[in-house]
Amino acid sequence: MNILVIDLTHGGVKIAVSLAKKGEKVYCYDIYNTLKDVDRRMLEVYNVRLIELKDLKEFKGDIKVIYPVHLPLTSEDISKNNENLNYTFITHHEAIAEILNGWGEDIDKIEITGVKGKTSCAFMLKEILIDENPLILSSLGSLIYEDKKEIILQKNISITPANIKETIDLANKLANPICDGKSKNQIYNSAIFESSLGVSGIGDVGLLTNIVEDYPIAQGRSSAGIAKRQVFRCGIVCCEKDSLDKYYKDISHENVNSFSFDDKSANLYVEDVEYCLDETKIHMVFNDVKTKSGKSVSGKMEIETFAPGKHHVMNVLGVAAAALSLNIDKDTITKGLKNYKGIPGRTNKKNMGNITVIEEINPGINTKAIEASINMLDDNENYIISIGGDYGITCEEIDEDAVAELINTLDKDIILTGEVGKSILNKLNRKVKFIKDYNSVYELAIKNSKNLLFIYRSDYRKLSKR
């Protein structure tokens, strides 16, 4: 069977080469014309041929088309180039599952998707699994932990499904520096993979954090909620209950564990919560949580961790559900979450000079996230609130009109910053301060002895500068 991999911008090269190494006859279509010379040479080495869709008219028999879930083409757009072919269509996620068939059967594997909270959940789970030397793909990079020490495998790596395979390959190269084609050593005993639009299905547990926004993809022909249905290919699914009820009622899956802030029909919910900007105490109840061993567990758990707002607590609930699903004991879960202090360059709290700074830095910041971050201050008047960001961070841009409408309703000291802040400034009907350089916002807060809530839609290229 011929294989056509579409989209070389979002991991297609890795998928194509991986399949070619298995002896498959592979072709590629570079739909966005972004192929780099080094990748072009890599394809040539493995006899992977670049084609246009019109070239399909020369093909005969069966063909498997591997496409990303956000592809701006329909199956009809592709098949019309040769209607005599016998087509099979699978996503990049599904292709990775096929490529990795049989991998990691002796370790715990978690795949994380959702609109918000993915990276935070990944690093909370890292704290819980730290003794198992976790291998991690996250939006902050490919990492591995050995004896609780972080080893960076690769920075500036996207969470496209192909990079699950890339992360595994990087870990194998680290353990086996002499490449003889045989994997002799394995450092990691667990794996945590973050993915943006669904999961591959190789996870023992698939964690769907939420669908707080069902934004359109594939030129409006699909959506985030539809793409993330792929999480139900995992053996056990942990899903925020509102999202489960709203988007996935039609799915039949034997091992679904739901979590909710206050819905007692969920498998895991909050009984009581005591918020604090340093460490929030969460009393949770869990009932009939399905686990990897095949048994169900019930009980109560008290968590103390960095979760200053309700949206952070929801992340904790998802992580707790995922950990319980892996038969991890309560003591290990509570100890791991107590060690979680936020993520530098993301959601974290720190002291700078004489002030406290809470940073909410995220490429997917939206109006709801901004509102939730402001609400966690609980009318504390000793805070400056700074809102801003960069453009071109993710496929979906921020709704500036909605953010402006929110700011218009706030009776708080607001500073706008960055490209996004400048654009929002022109949409307001109230006066707020604009500071172009976000570093100057920190300086102003320190000078005036005012604590700072810094909410920023980030460009990862600038993370190292903060």
Where are these regions (language model features)?
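Short, basic phosphate-binding NTP loop
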Residues: 1-111, 278, 439-445, 464
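ATP-dependent carboxylate-amine ligase
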Residues: 1-35, 44-45, 65, 130-131, ...
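Adenine nucleotide phosphate-binding catalytic loops in nucleotide-utilizing enzymes
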Residues: 5-8, 21, 28, 221-222, ...
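Active-site regions of enzymes building and remodeling cell-envelope glycoconjugates
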Residues: 24, 39-52, 82-90, 149-155, ...
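Short, charged/polar "capping" segments at the starts of alpha-helices
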Residues: 33-40, 58, 71-79, 144, ...
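Walker A (P-loop) phosphate-binding motif
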Residues: 97-141, 148
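Conserved substrate/cofactor phosphate-moiety recognition/catalytic segment
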Residues: 134-169
